[in-house]
Amino acid sequence: MESESARMSSAAEARFRINSPNSQPRAVKVIALDTPSERVVKELAQSPWQRATFLTASAFSGAPRQGERFSMGGWLNDLAGRTKNLVDEVESADLVVMVASAGENAAAAAIIGEACNVKRVMTTALILAPPPEGKVGVSDETLSKMLSALRPHAMMLVISSADEYIKDMLAALRA
């Protein structure tokens, strides 16, 4: 009996295959959640992209103090430092990629994830876990805490020990 893979790679099935890439690149918003990941996102932004926008949420300070009003637009910035409105950015996205460094504060992921959920925009969280200088890697406890913080707010979670992975992923998504 022929396997499904063998059958699908036959000449008879090849006529149904689509050999051209997606006709339109995805609008991807890449958001650094903390200061260390901001450096990586700024480096990524130097590459040529079709429809990728790079933002930072490292100015997010958590819930407003008692008596203060919460603003969706006061803490998200583009790489030039201009304030951006989270809802507007999410509405114009096909995918939001949140980049966080293991061991850092990723509190902004909750609000970004909620905005994406309301607008039905896919989310991915990338955890940067490069080994500290002279060490083998990030501790399991540190990774576990970060995974727990991001899991409720991302459809897909990826742990990366190299910054290049993000660039490769965005290229594969035709960002």
Question: Locations of the language-model features?
Answer:
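Short N-terminal or domain-adjacent regulatory/targeting segments
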Residues: 1-26, 80
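Glycine-rich, small/polar surface segments that engage phosphate groups of diverse ligands
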Residues: 20-79
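Structural motif
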Residues: 30-35, 100-102, 128-129, 162
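A short, aliphatic-rich alpha-helical micro-motif
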Residues: 87-91, 150-151
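Short, glycine-rich nucleotide/cofactor-binding loops
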Residues: 95-106
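Amphipathic helical hotspot of TIR/SEFIR-family domains
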Residues: 106-119
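Short beta-alpha junction loops
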Residues: 121-141
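Structural recognition of alpha->loop->beta junctions
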Residues: 134-175
